């Protein structure tokens, strides 16, 4: 059975939902306090929340904890690493993904459902999706405006779109360059995304579109 560590920093608040989403997808998951080792896990998820209360910058303090050194080693081995919302911010602060998450173009906290277009299905996180598929997931962030000077440094996986899949300025909730909602490293095994797939993993939550992120990882690792 594929087993994931869901990292818990002080201020993390999406860990329980993430564990349940992984279990619904057919994997095993445990909440792991950031001072514990993650070396024996098949993959790692850094969930959302407000680690260290977003002091300095969102994700800045968490990115400098010892556990991130182990996560870097796992990433270099090719194991899947997923950062959701604050987890994405932590991955960029730790230089596991290029770019940075800046304050939203309208400087306020955004909490709403958005549409996403899946543009790269050749990753462990998306291979159960169809290329061009439009999915619906929620966002909840104040610093989700992704900036990168050269987008060729990453693989764009999700883009904010309208419900028909058109990539428009109106569909971009936070000002991210190229409407980027999620990217991987060039190898494809480290994904950062601002939308919350764990909050779209059950029909009673309003959407199951995010469950395929976790199902994709589990099935990919079984291959």
Swiss-Prot record:
Gene: purQ
EC number, as in UniProt: 6.3.5.3, 3.5.1.2
Location of the Glutamine amidotransferase type-1 domain: 4-223
Recorded metabolic or biological pathway in which this protein acts: Purine metabolism; IMP biosynthesis via de novo pathway; 5-amino-1-(5-phospho-D-ribosyl)imidazole from N(2)-formyl-N(1)-(5-phospho-D-ribosyl)glycinamide: step 1/2
UniProt cross-references to Pfam families, sorted A to Z: GATase_5
Quaternary context: Part of the FGAM synthase complex composed of 1 PurL, 1 PurQ and 2 PurS subunits.
Catalytic site positions: 85 (nucleophile), 196, 198
Xref: InterPro entries: Class_I_gatase-like, PRibForGlyAmidine_synth_PurQ
Matches recorded under PANTHER family: PHOSPHORIBOSYLFORMYLGLYCINAMIDINE SYNTHASE SUBUNIT PURQ
Function per UniProt: Part of the phosphoribosylformylglycinamidine synthase complex involved in the purines biosynthetic pathway. Catalyzes the ATP-dependent conversion of formylglycinamide ribonucleotide (FGAR) and glutamine to yield formylglycinamidine ribonucleotide (FGAM) and glutamate. The FGAM synthase complex is composed of three subunits. PurQ produces an ammonia molecule by converting glutamine to glutamate. PurL transfers the ammonia molecule to FGAR to form FGAM in an ATP-dependent manner.
Chemical reaction(s) catalysed: N(2)-formyl-N(1)-(5-phospho-beta-D-ribosyl)glycinamide + L-glutamine + ATP + H2O = 2-formamido-N(1)-(5-O-phospho-beta-D-ribosyl)acetamidine + L-glutamate + ADP + phosphate + H(+); L-glutamine + H2O = L-glutamate + NH4(+)
Protein name, as recorded: Phosphoribosylformylglycinamidine synthase subunit PurQ
GO biological process: 'de novo' IMP biosynthetic process
Keyword Aminoacyl-tRNA synthetase: no
Taxonomic lineage: Archaea, Methanobacteriati, Methanobacteriota, Thermococci, Thermococcales
């Amino acid at each position: 059975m594929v087993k994931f560590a869901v990292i818990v920093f002080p201020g993390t608040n999406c860990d329980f939902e993430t564990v349940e989403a992984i279990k619904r997808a057919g994997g095993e998951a445990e909440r792991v306090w950031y001072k514990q080792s993650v070396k024996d896990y098949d993959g790692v998820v850094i969930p959302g929340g407000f680690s260290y209360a977003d002091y300095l910058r969102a994700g800045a303090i968490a990115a400098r904890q010892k556990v991130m050194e182990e996560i870097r080693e796992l990433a270099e081995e090719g194991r899947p690493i997923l950062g959701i919302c604050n987890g994405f911010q932590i991955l960029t602060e730790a230089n596991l993904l290029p770019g940075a998450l800046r304050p939203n173009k309208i400087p306020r906290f955004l909490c709403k459902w958005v549409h996403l277009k899946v543009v790269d299905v050749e990753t462990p996180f998306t291979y159960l999706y169809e290329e061009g598929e439009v999915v619906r997931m929620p966002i909840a962030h104040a610093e989700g405006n992704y900036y990168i000077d050269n987008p060729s440094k990453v693989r764009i996986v999700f883009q904010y779109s309208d419900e028909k899949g058109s990539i428009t300025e109106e569909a971009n909730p936070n000002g991210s360059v190229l409407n980027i909602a999620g990217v991987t490293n060039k190898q494809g095994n480290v994904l950062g995304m601002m939308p919350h797939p764990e909050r779209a993993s059950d029909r009673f939550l309003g959407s199951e579109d995010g469950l395929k992120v976790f199902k994709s990882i589990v099935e990919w690792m079984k291959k």
